[in-house]
Amino acid sequence: MSGNKVEVDKRRTFAIISHPDAGKTTITEKVLLFGNALQKAGTVKGKKSGQHAKSDWMEMEKDRGISITTSVMQFPYGGALINLLDTPGHEDFSEDTYRTLTAVDSCLMVIDSAKGVEDRTIKLMEVTRLRDTPIVTFMNKCDRDIRDPIELMDEVEDILKIACAPITWPIGSGKEFKGVYHILRDEIILYQSGMGHTIQEERIIKGLHNPELDKVLGSYANEIRDEMELVAGASNEFNQEAFLKGELTPVYFGTALGNFGVDHILDGIVEWAPKPLPRESDVRNVTPDEEKFSGFIFKIQANMDPKHRDRVAFMRVCSGRYEQGMKMHHVRIGKDVNVSDALTFMAGDRSRAEAAYPGDIIGLHNHGTMRIGDTFTQGEKLRFTGVPNFAPEMFRRIRLKDPLKQKQLLKGLVQLSEEGAVQVFRPIDSNDLIVGAVGVLQFEVVVGRLKSEYNVEAIYEGISVSTARWVYCKDERKLEEFRRKCSQNLALDGGNNLTYIAPTMVNLNLSMERYPDVEFAKTREH
């Protein structure tokens, strides 16, 4: 087993989380650049050249310049093998992002240093809290005018309830951005702008009290010395144990666009971030060093290859080793499958996986049998937990332009809901189809994909639905009574789970009071 252990110990699997426009896609590009995975990083907004960001590869993403789907990239760095999951940054694509966070062992949080903590970051951090995921923080855009760094860290501590330990500290900002002081190494790393795929060789001055610093920085030298005395008294020291518990975050400063500071983060992730962690199942904890293979599906993606109408299920490997041609047991349906063509990814560039280890993400071709949350083992009947469905926040009724295509519409919606792109509800008392999403852009995506993939033209209508809850009751008799009396508010979701569709929050609260034995759940395990 030693070969397996060596491979597992090398892995670092993390996702990047941020508010839209904090620079997440740029960071993703630069992380790949520093890992030599990309020779030329695509800048995100300069689309005229036809140079699209490597991790934004669905048509709609290319049109809009936002990353809609989760891409997976693997590359070596500093003796480790990094699996980076690029999560949708646009605020409307949060549910897919939430689920991706269940497949990683740590997260890199990117904050726009001019703006500080923003609302989408708050929501994403709430999800990482469900599993106490370790967080590394990058204060981006230091080559612009930024807020006071101590103020930024105070805000992270106050709002996100996580202690901050600065690892690097900015010297100046905007046009006067001179570089950073690396606190742990006692080094000044001078800023030299590198754009696109140019990485400037770092110019380093050893020691905060080195006279060389005065020659290079002039009055800034004493300024940073004074500031570091203040910082030492006002901030936390880095503590790896607190970091691994999700209680403390190491903080780095830099500019992703200027190719500066990204390698400092990667060094920290390699040194401190956890290697693949054990996973909870309904039976027991599964550890990465177990001999037998196991993994779970956290995302399903249609049409990764425009030439084929295929669907790929993304699997996080949890234990053992994937080998080409191996037999896996699909626990939910109780069937064995031979897998010879699993994929590894370089953001849309796919290649056949020869082998994969815990922490790795592989793609399985899915012909409609796999769902989000499905567990695969080498025979053991266990189910990994903690891959949630979140109650949608917005609803529309969907209607066909051509009524004869009802069958294709339903098929398309169910497949898109299994993929996690949207949720679909079929009211018990009517033939309506209701689509639920976490943001407006998801509705657009669904109509676009129904047209291009299923040849179905659909339109939306408003509907008075405020929220949805999955309903459960241990007492069959009481559940039957509830179904009978509330049928006008009940629907089945894409997986045939009973759901309460509330026209208003007042209506929901009244029903919850009236039926105390019925559980109204905001999330549902897949």
UniProtKB/Swiss-Prot annotation:
UniProt entry tagged with the keyword Transmembrane helix: no
Name of the gene encoding the protein in the UniProt record: prfC
Keywords in alphabetical order: Cytoplasm, GTP-binding, Nucleotide-binding, Protein biosynthesis
Pfam families, A to Z: EF-G_D2, GTP_EFTU, RF3_C
Species this chain originates from: Shewanella frigidimarina (strain NCIMB 400)
Domain tr-type G: 9-277
The name this protein goes by in its record: Peptide chain release factor 3
Location(s) in or outside the cell: Cytoplasm
Superkingdom assignment: Bacteria
HAMAP family associated with the record: Rel_fac_3
A biological-process GO annotation: regulation of translational termination
Keyword Metal-binding applies: no
A GO cellular component entry from the record: cytosol
Family affiliation: Belongs to the TRAFAC class translation factor GTPase superfamily. Classic translation factor GTPase family. PrfC subfamily.
InterPro entries: EF-G-like_DII, EFG_III/V, G_TR_CS, P-loop_NTPase, PrfC, RF3_C, RF3_dom_3_sf, RF3_GTP-bd
PANTHER family from the UniProt entry: PEPTIDE CHAIN RELEASE FACTOR RF3
Residues noted as binding GTP in the record, renumbered to the chain: 18-25, 86-90, 140-143
Function of the molecule: Increases the formation of ribosomal termination complexes and stimulates activities of RF-1 and RF-2. It binds guanine nucleotides and has strong preference for UGA stop codons. It may interact directly with the ribosome. The stimulation of RF-1 and RF-2 is significantly reduced by GTP and GDP, but not by GMP.
